[in-house]
Swiss-Prot record:
Active site: 496 (proton donor)
Catalytic activity: 3',5'-cyclic GMP + H2O = GMP + H(+)
Prosequence residues removed at maturation: 891-893
Gene of this entry: Pde6
Protein name per the record: cGMP-specific 3',5'-cyclic phosphodiesterase
Length: 893
């Protein structure tokens, strides 16, 4: 059954509608067009090139209805025909988008008879028609030749059938091209993924990495040769490691463009001599040729000069004709190597900081065509991966160097951090006194009277008394060396030094022994706690975690939380790992992991931030009557609270010890405050501000109330044998509160290197003359108040306020000065010397100044405020109640 023309037309449309293989589709189109128009043969050209350089490429040529697909494709690829837009019949159709119907080909000047001469075929009629996409852009040209039904030319009916069929074919061709592009994109992505994997697999071998990238690029882009020039790496690596933590800049999308000028080239040509490595991959070779070109080699190579041009300008160069480009850029010399070179695609390779570290170069497409924008886009991805790979390799190499340097530094540090053999031998030979000699069992222990060697002996005694040396088979020489090494690794800061570590360890020892808390601990935990106490402030710099963060110190970058505590633990591990210092060497692996976990947790617990996190959970356990502390979490809580209790135990020492330690703490804090003002230009908090030193008593009271008392109170509730810590803290709170009240009355007390006395003492002698001191005395007539029945509505303001003393100092007041001043004042009041010493009178501060039963008759008040010189020996004020007045004055003084 024969199909009519309409049915055949629809059948042929269905034949091509779902075809996505571009070769098969084009073959079907030409065969079907031959059936519809009775054409002898046909050709199909596809549009290629850039907007400024478009041309037609013969996809299939001279296809008849009997030509097999394979033969047609093979012939087209073997004899690739390229027709620029505007040249020849097909070129004119592509340029004008207009159909051309030629009845006699040889009479048309646009016809090229060379093919007829080669094949012996005679072309008579030609019908050439454009193929457009849905946007109206040319995507191809179809051409049919000679009618087979006896007609000499294509008529209007043929033209209409041809046009209608090609309309549908245009849609099919565009779909097939899109499918082909998606397949290519998929393949490209697979290659890029493989390259990404290679970057990390080959990070220790730059040559293998670059060779693999070049091989993939050459195969994907179908070019003859591929080269990579690398800039002198020594000039680029100086800032790699410093910028590792910086956010890398995004690489900007680079569009290919023609480089027209070279005005700045010569000024920047110093870059030319920086190429030190050249990778070349050409022909069928799978291995790159790696060389180190000399300056002479670079200067006599046109390809190298073009690469230097790209490295200088930082722009991609897509050269269609090398000879023309070289003539336009006369600063580049043409050498013989470019005789066989036609097209070049050259692109800079940059690192994360957008610094040019090399140039990638593609030479000659296998098809003989110029490189397209699509080629440039794909090649850019290879250049980016090449840059990442080179950068990553450099970083890896530098990291390896840094690791080697770190090992050397650790070896040196370990050597210098370890105690000397002479010191160790001496400590081994020294006799170790009993624990009672050092007062180790007491919560009132102080190290003030111990020399440095005694502090080490005291530590050894604590280990012996806890039976740790024999229990865990610690070699005595190793223990001695470890103790000396720990002492050596404390810096000579004012408070957080070796002596502070000794005091913390002794408090832990006293809590375990005197406080009977050892019954709740295993021997391994006792070992870990004592080691943690001795190491909990190793290498302390006299500054806190907040200071490390503010200054962005390396420690703050290394440890984001509990900065110093993590550093202390790392220093502890470093000492233990040093030769001859591992006191845990005889432990089993399981015991070693357990004791190290205890040490780490205990040291980190000395961060008050950790204390505040754990405190509520501990308080809840105690309030619920917990008595079993053997669970892992509960034991960790208990050890953490014990570490904090030991760390702040100076607050529970006798007053003569506590206020000396407080002065050391204050001095260290003030030093940090000075650094914050100097380095950060910020105002430090009150406790670190030297200008607010008089507020220290008040801040000590706050510290006791917020941290110390709640902690010691809850520990004493559960473990009553450590009550001395709580009681000592209470007593010191009363002393600090007393000082705080005196400071509020205008007395300073911390102007000296030591604060042996709670009230400020100034240099002075008994013979110094009291002068330049003005004071004001206001006296209240107590009887007058009682006569008014307690109603003070008629009492003058200065009488209602009671007795007051105001001293204006123009110089420093010493104790002797104040004593003479008080004597002068008393003598001016009643002409007699005070019968009570200053120390005794200070105990009367709490006496009621408004006592209704005075021991002496009421006296008239002095009247209004009177101003006297300190050198005055008499007063017109009359007599007053001596005992009350003396108590008040001495309290104020």
């Amino acid at each position: 059954m024969e199909l009519d023309e309409g049915e055949l037309f629809m059948e042929l449309i269905r034949d091509v509608a779902n075809e996505l293989d571009i070769d098969v589709l084009c073959h079907k189109i030409l065969v079907n067009v031959g059936l519809l128009t009775h054409a002898d043969r046909g050709s199909l050209f596809l549009a290629k090139g850039t907007p400024n350089n478009k041309y037609l490429v013969a996809k299939l040529f001279d296809v008849t209805q009997k030509t097999a697909l394979k033969d047609a494709v093979t012939r087209a690829r073997a004899e690739e025909i390229i027709i620029p837009f505007g040249i020849g019949i097909a070129g004119m159709v592509a340029q004008t988008k207009e159909m051309i119907n030629i009845k006699e080909a040889y009479m048309d000047a646009r016809f090229n008879c060379e093919i007829d001469l080669k094949t012996g075929y005679k072309t008579n009629a030609i019908l050439c028609m454009p193929i457009c996409n849905y946007e109206g852009d040319i995507i191809g040209v179809a051409q049919i030749i000679n009618k087979t039904n006896g007609c000499m030319e294509f008529d209007e009916h043929d033209v209409e059938i041809f046009r209608r069929y090609l309309t549908f074919c245009g849609i099919g061709i565009q779909n097939a091209q899109l499918f082909e592009m998606s397949v290519q994109e998929y393949r490209r992505n697979q290659i890029l993924l493989n390259l990404a994997r290679s970057i990390f697999e080959e990070q220790n071998n730059l040559e293998c990495l670059v060779t693999k990238i070049m091989t993939e690029a050459r195969e994907l882009l179908k070019c003859e040769r591929c080269s990579v020039f690398l800039v002198d790496l020594d000039c680029c690596e100086e800032s790699h490691l410093e910028k590792i933590i910086e956010k890398p800049h995004q690489l900007e999308q680079r569009a290919t463009r023609a480089i027209k000028g070279g005005d700045s080239f010569e000024e920047k040509q110093k870059m030319r001599n920086r190429f030190t490595v050249l990778f070349e991959l050409g022909g069928e070779s799978q291995a790159a040729n790696v060389s180190r070109p000399s300056i002479n080699d670079l200067s006599h190579s046109t390809l190298a000069q073009i690469a230097q041009f790209v490295a200088t300008t930082g722009q991609t160069v897509n050269i269609c004709d090398v000879h023309d480009w070289v003539r336009e850029h006369n600063q580049i010399r043409a050498e013989g190597e470019i005789d066989s070179t036609h097209a070049i695609l050259c692109m800079p390779i940059v690192n994360a900081q957008k610094t040019v570290i090399g140039v990638a170069q593609l030479i000659n497409k296998a098809s003989g065509l110029p490189f397209t924008e699509s080629d440039a886009s794909i090649f850019e991805a290879f250049a980016i991966f090449c840059g990442l790979g080179i950068h990553n390799t450099q970083m890896y190499e530098n990291a390896c160097k840094l690791m080697a340097k770190q090992k050397v530094a650790l070896e040196c540090l370990s050597y210098h951090a370890t105690a000397g053999q002479d010191q160790t031998e001496k400590l081994i030979q020294d006799p170790i006194a009993e624990a009672e000699t050092y007062n180790l069992y007491s919560f009132t222990f102080t190290d003030f009277d111990l020399v440095d060697d005694d502090t080490c002996r005291a530590v050894l005694r604590m280990f012996m008394q806890c039976n740790l040396v024999s229990q865990f088979h610690i070699p005595y020489d190793v223990l001695c060396r470890w103790v000396l090494s720990v002492r050596k690794n404390y810096r000579p800061v004012k408070y957080h030094n070796w002596r502070h570590a000794l005091n913390v360890a002794q408090t832990m020892f006293a809590m375990l022994k005197t406080g009977k808390m050892e019954r709740f601990m295993t021997d391994l935990e006792i070992l870990g706690l004592l080691v943690a106490c001795l190491c909990h402030d190793l290498d302390h710099r006299g500054t806190n975690n907040a200071f490390q963060t503010k200054t962005e110190s390396p420690l703050a970058i290394l440890y984001t939380t509990s900065t110093m505590e993590h550093h202390h633990f790392d220093q502890c591990v470093m000492i233990l790992n040093s030769e001859g210092n591992n006191i845990f060497q005889a432990l089993s692996p399981e015991d070693y992991r357990s004791v190290m976990k205890t040490v780490e947790s205990a040291i980190l617990s000395t961060d008050l931030a950790m204390y505040f996190k754990k405190r509520n959970a501990f308080l809840e356990l105690v309030e619920n009557g917990e008595f079993d502390w053997q669970g892992e979490e509960k034991k960790d809580l208990l050890c953490g609270m014990m570490m904090t209790a030991c760390d702040v135990s100076a607050i529970a020492k006798p007053w003569e010890v506590q206020h000396r330690v407080a002065k050391l703490v204050a001095d260290e804090f003030f030093d940090q405050g000075d650094l914050e003002k100097l380095q950060l230009n910020t105002q430090p908090v009150a406790m670190m501000d030297r200008e607010r030193k008089d507020e220290l008593p008040k801040m000590q009271v706050g510290f006791i109330d917020v941290i110390c008392l709640p902690l010691y109170r809850v520990l004493c509730d559960t473990f009553p044998w450590i009550t001395p810590l709580y009681e000592g803290t209470l007593e010191n709170r009363r002393n600090w509160q007393d000082l705080a009240e005196k400071v509020e009355m205008g007395l300073t007390w911390i102007d000296h290197d030591t604060i042996d006395k709670p009230v400020e003492e100034f240099a002075g002698c008994a013979d110094e003359e009291i002068k330049d001191i003005e004071f004001t005395v206001t006296t209240l007539n107590c009887n007058q108040q009682s006569q008014h029945g307690g109603d003070d509505s008629h009492t003058p303001e200065h009488q209602r306020s009671g007795s007051r003393l105001s001293i204006k100092k123009t110089g420093a007041l010493g104790k002797v000065v104040r004593s003479k001043l008080s004597k002068t004042l008393y003598n001016s009041m009643d002409g007699s010397k005070p019968k009570t010493s200053l120390k005794l009178l200070e105990s009367h501060v709490s006496e009621d100044m408004d006592d209704k039963s005075p021991t002496s008759p009421s006296q008239p008040h002095l009247g209004s405020v009177g101003r006297m010189s300190a050198s005055s020996s008499t007063s017109s004020a009359g007599t007053v109640d001596k005992s009350k007045k003396r108590s008040k004055l001495c309290a104020l003084l």
